[in-house]
């Protein structure tokens, strides 16, 4: 081999080794250069992610992501990291991650195999399950008992997928958790199938006009969304989440949002972490059991 060509190859190899490990990750490079992290949140997914007093983004997932951001800032040795919040709907959340309008989504997204074809996920921070919200005087307890009923679902949600498996139902698409609960309360739908935690919050909020019934129809690991093309950023998120779990910070944040009165709501959900989440807090890792229809 010509000596000049050998020297050129050697120089190229050395230069490649000298590149920083995050150079191929455009998301992380943008965060470092701009000093800004754009977070997507939901307007009405209490207690996980919702607009609080004055429209301020609040909730369990939002506060966890704020802690993540602080640790990412420290890890990257940034003098400051400005957080910019963008409201996103269930229908558009994956597109907003894909087009870079948001770099992290902190809400109620279920980690599934199909969705991992489009986006990547951080560690699980809550295990939800689809259940039914019905009017207070409705005696039906199971989706299989609904017959030809009108069932509200959010387009693109796992609640929609669960409901589509039940023959005979007329599915009524709604844009949000609040709209689904309102449709049931006003008689425009007979039931609303969605994440149990959001339904429990809506039942408390509506003070006896609606109720959550039946066992869970699924087991769904909820986690933050990141771009599937941002492996370095995803690794940072996962490591920061492990630290939050191991030092007890995540458990304290959970207590604030699930076991104490909700800010601006005046009631507590009184929901201690279940066995799955307790195990995740104790032994955090990136393994996830794909969501299951029961």
Each PLM stretch: what is its role?
Residues 33, 161-174, 212, 242-294:
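Ligand-binding clefts/hinges and TM-proximal coupling segments of bilobed small-molecule sensing domains
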Residues 91-92, 106-118, 162-165, 185-219:
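A ligand-binding cleft/hinge motif common to bilobed small-molecule-binding domains
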Residues 43, 126-134, 200-242, 260-283:
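Periplasmic-binding protein-like
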Residues 25-105, 117:
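Extracytoplasmic small-molecule ligand-binding "clamshell" domains
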Residues 38, 44-47, 57-74, 110, ...:
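Bilobed "Venus flytrap"/periplasmic-binding protein-like clamshell domains
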Residues 18-21:
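N-terminal signal peptide c-region/cleavage motif recognized by signal peptidases
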Residues 78-95, 138, 158, 172-182, ...:
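Short helix-initiation/N-cap motifs at beta->coil->alpha
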